[in-house]
Amino acid sequence: MGGEERSGDGEKRGEEVVDAGSLFVLKSKGTWWHCGFHLTTSIVAPALLSLPYAFKFLGWAAGISCLVGGAAVTFYSYTLLSLTLEHHASLGNRYLRFRDMAHHILSPKWGRYYVGPIQMAVCYGVVIANALLGGQCLKAMYLVVQPNGEMKLFEFVIIFGCLLLVLAQFPSFHSLRYINSLSLLLCLLYSASAAAASIYIGKEPNAPEKDYTIVGDPETRVFGIFNAMAIIATTYGNGIIPEIQATISAPVKGKMMKGLCMCYLVVIMTFFTVAITGYWAFGKKANGLIFTNFLNAETNHYFVPTWFIFLVNLFTVLQLSAVAVVYLQPINDILESVISDPTKKEFSIRNVIPRLVVRSLFVVMATIVAAMLPFFGDVNSLLGAFGFIPLDFVLPVVFFNFTFKPSKKSFIFWINTVIAVVFSCLGVIAMVAAVRQIIIDANTYKLFADV
């Protein structure tokens, strides 16, 4: 492979890595365009629709500062992670997974007991959260058509799970390239729609009063600030950069940077427009999902045409399915390594049947959890605090310092150290804030609740 040896968890036979996960799921066949599609799908997701909600705890100045800071730090961190991967590839060891990097750069225990488990928890948490949000969007579409309909949320979660069940059978990360190119278009469509609707509603004579004051007692406001910062950090989160870079064909040098530039162009076009227009229109009344603000709570009628509500929810549902299947790939990689025989063909009966059964089982389990726990968003905040923040803000700079060993007197050493320390502290505080929110909301939790 262009002089680069693909390093996975499996045994090696000469030049061949006997690891079904790397052979079947993490195929290195993509271009930088494909990489850009994968990156955009994993980062520019419907979680961005909660950015106006984060702003209401921060206000204009702090909100925009955090949004700019999140973009700058994650772009920097992802660039360092990519450069670290390219460096090891140039030395003959191409690491395909986050846990492989931790294993070889830090120690085997870091890969096995820390990075691997938290990455899997984050990925599966994203799948569950997307199934729940997909069900909520499907229900919103249903209520547009049948305002007095009696179907419950868990039924729509199951419908979304059926869609995900089909998409989960795509054999490899690379095989998702066309789905993820469509995903890029969808995120532009629902972001532009959300921004346009916010501007339209904000200019209406009967628009909600624009109030940007930050409410609550000092304790609530402090926790609100850290909660909002965690929301923004998680929205920029990825957690699977090495797996995405693994899909690029050799030589990899420079391709990831092009993909990142493409992705962050979309980030700027979507994150900032939705956050600023949504907060401008609704202020402190901004909800966790900006679409819910399009309903006039006093009249129970939408500020915008119902066909518009149907369309933006459709765009969101379709992209949610793409995001979920992207985050299934690291899980599929592990499953494939366990259940498949790398000495057999990828589509042999020996490999296809176990793949179909096990992938379907994991999707069904995620769908059941999403249907049972419609309050999973609180739990997902906790997962984001201890998962996305270390994976995307802390470990990349640590890997870079351990790999390149910059002088302790150099600027890059200290900026990396400061980033690692600051975001480690933010992660701990965000976990405390998430646990506090779970305790506050515990009395409202109900299995299979129709929210």
From Swiss-Prot:
Q: Could you tell me what induces this protein?
A: By wounding and senescence.
Q: How does activity depend on pH?
A: Optimum pH is 4.5-5.5.
Entry's Gene Ontology BP terms = gamma-aminobutyric acid transport
Membrane topology annotation: Multi-pass membrane protein
MF annotations from Gene Ontology: gamma-aminobutyric acid transmembrane transporter activity
Localization: Cell membrane
Q: Key word Membrane present in the record?
A: yes
Question: What tissues harbor this protein?
Answer: Highly expressed in flowers and at lower levels in roots, leaves and stems.
Q: Transmembrane stretches, by residue range?
A: 35-55, 57-77, 115-135, 153-173, 182-202, 222-242, 262-282, 308-328, 356-376, 382-402, 411-431
Q: Tell me the first and last residues of the signal peptide.
A: none
Keyword list (alphabetical) reads: Amino-acid transport, Cell membrane, Membrane, Transmembrane, Transmembrane helix, Transport
Cell inner membrane among the record's keywords? Answer: no
PANTHER family per UniProt: OS05G0424000 PROTEIN-RELATED (PTHR48017)
Protein family per UniProt? Belongs to the amino acid/polyamine transporter 2 family. Amino acid/auxin permease (AAAP) (TC 2.A.18.2) subfamily.
Purpose: High affinity gamma-aminobutyric acid (GABA) transporter probably involved in GABA uptake into cells. When expressed in a heterologous system (Xenopus oocytes), imports GABA, butylamine, beta- and L-Alanine, 5-aminovaleric acid, 6-aminocaproic acid and 8-aminocaprylic acid, but does not mediate the transport of proline or glycine betaine.
Q: What name is this protein filed under?
A: GABA transporter 1
Species, as recorded: Arabidopsis thaliana (Mouse-ear cress)
